[in-house]
C-alpha cells in the first residue's frame, strides 16, 4: 500500500476511535461479562456467586469490595478478569457487592459492615458453599473491613486472609500520610476542635460525600496515574484494544458511589487522621478491636508504585497479628493497577493462586 494512503487510513482509524470514545462510550465497555448468580440480598449488600467449572478446593474465595466503587474491577475484561482467573483455578468465587448507597445511608459506619453485613454474608456463603471456612480477600478500604471482621470473629470462618493496599500505618503512606499527620498535629492543639472532629459530633450529612466527588478525589490522589492513562490513549488511538480498555477503565473511575458520612468519620477522621491501626487496636462505638486476634494464614500485598497506600503503610499488619503464617509481597502497579494491570495478572495472580492452593483443602 502507498505510504501516504496508509497514513491516511491510520489517521481515519484514530479519528473513528476517538469519536467512539467520546460520543459512544457505553458501547465500548467490556467489564462484567462473566455470568453470576445472586444467592442472597441483605440490607445494602448482594452476594454474587461465580461457580468454578472444575471446583478443586473446599473453601470458597470471597472478595469483599471497598465502598464507592462499582464491581467492574473484579471482572474488568473478558480476557483479564480476577473472578474468572480464580474460577478457572478451581475455586468457587463469591463477591460481596455493596448496593448503590446514597444520602439516606449517611449514618452507616464501619460497624454497619464489619459487625452486621459481613457476618451475615459470610454465614450465608458458608451455608451455600457447604464449607465452614472461607478464604477472604479485601482491597483498599475493604482490607480494613476484612481485617477488623476477622479480628472480631477469629477463628469462626476465615482460614486464609488476603489484605491488599490497606492503610495500617497511615502516616507512613508517603505524601498523603504526612499530610494527615500534619493535620492531626494541628487539630491536637485545640481540644475543642479535636473533640468535635474525633468524637463523632459532626453531623453526618456534612461529611457524606457523593459518588461524583469520590471519583474526582480518587483522580486527585493519583493525578500522575490519570494523566498517564490519557497520554497512553492519545498515543495509541489506532489500537482498538487500548481504546476499549480506556473506555472500560474510564467508566469504572467515573461511576463511583457515595461514601456515607459515618464511613468518612471512621475512615478519614479515625483511620487516616488518628492512625490507630498502627498500634493494632481501634475503638469503634463500644467495641475495642485488636488485630492480634487474627491467627489465620495472612497474605499482605502492596502496590510497588501505589501513591495512596504505600508498602510502608500496608506492611505493618503482619507484625500486629498472631498469625504464624504471614506472607508480604509487592505487586506491580499503583493502588488501582495492583488489582487490574496486565503485569499484575501475569506476575501476581499466579503467585496469589499458588499461595492459596497450598493453604486450601482439596
For the regions a language model picked out, list residue spans one by one.
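Alpha/beta-hydrolase active-site loop
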Residues: 108-126
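Catalytic histidine-centered segment of alpha/beta-hydrolase-like enzymes
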Residues: 308, 333-347
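Short alpha-helix in the alpha/beta-hydrolase fold that links the catalytic acid
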Residues: 284, 296, 310-319
Amino acid at each position: 500500500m502507498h505510504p501516504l494512503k496508509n497514513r491516511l487510513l491510520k489517521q481515519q482509524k484514530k479519528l473513528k476511535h476517538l469519536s467512539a470514545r467520546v460520543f459512544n462510550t457505553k458501547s465500548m465497555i467490556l467489564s462484567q461479562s462473566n455470568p453470576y448468580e445472586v444467592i442472597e440480598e441483605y440490607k445494602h449488600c448482594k452476594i454474587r456467586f461465580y461457580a468454578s467449572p472444575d471446583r478443586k478446593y473446599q473453601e470458597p474465595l470471597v472478595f469483599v469490595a471497598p465502598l464507592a466503587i462499582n464491581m467492574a474491577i473484579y471482572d474488568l475484561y473478558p480476557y483479564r478478569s480476577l473472578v474468572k482467573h480464580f474460577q478457572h483455578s478451581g475455586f468457587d468465587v463469591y463477591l460481596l457487592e455493596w448496593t448503590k448507597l446514597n444520602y439516606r445511608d449517611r449514618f452507616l459506619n464501619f460497624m454497619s459492615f464489619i459487625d452486621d453485613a459481613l457476618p451475615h454474608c459470610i454465614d450465608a456463603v458458608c451455608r451455600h458453599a457447604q464449607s465452614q471456612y472461607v478464604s477472604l480477600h479485601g482491597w483498599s478500604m475493604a482490607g480494613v473491613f476484612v481485617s477488623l471482621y476477622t479480628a472480631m470473629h477469629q477463628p469462626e470462618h476465615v482460614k486464609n486472609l488476603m489484605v491488599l493496599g490497606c492503610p495500617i500505618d497511615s502516616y507512613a503512606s508517603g505524601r498523603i500520610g504526612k499530610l494527615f499527620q500534619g493535620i492531626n498535629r494541628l487539630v491536637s492543639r485545640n481540644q475543642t476542635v479535636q473533640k468535635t472532629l474525633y468524637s463523632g459530633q459532626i453531623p453526618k450529612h456534612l461529611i457524606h460525600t457523593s459518588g461524583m466527588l469520590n471519583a474526582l478525589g480518587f483522580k486527585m490522589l493519583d493525578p500522575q496515574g490519570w494523566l498517564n492513562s490519557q497520554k497512553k490513549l492519545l498515543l495509541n488511538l489506532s489500537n482498538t484494544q487500548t481504546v476499549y480498555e480506556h473506555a472500560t477503565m474510564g467508566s469504572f473511575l467515573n461511576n463511583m458511589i457515595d461514601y456515607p458520612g459515618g464511613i468518612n468519620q471512621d475512615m478519614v477522621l479515625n483511620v487516616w487522621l488518628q492512625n490507630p491501626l498502627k498500634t493494632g487496636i481501634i475503638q469503634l462505638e463500644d467495641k475495642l478491636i485488636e488485630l492480634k486476634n487474627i491467627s489465620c494464614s495472612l497474605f499482605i500485598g502492596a502496590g510497588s508504585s501505589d501513591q495512596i497506600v504505600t508498602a510502608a503503610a500496608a506492611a505493618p499488619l503482619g507484625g500486629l497479628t498472631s498469625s504464624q503464617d504471614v506472607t508480604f509481597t509487592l505487586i506491580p502497579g499503583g493502588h488501582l493497577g495492583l488489582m487490574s494491570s496486565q503485569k499484575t495478572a501475569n506476575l501476581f495472580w499466579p503467585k496469589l493462586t499458588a499461595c492459596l492452593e497450598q493453604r486450601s483443602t482439596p
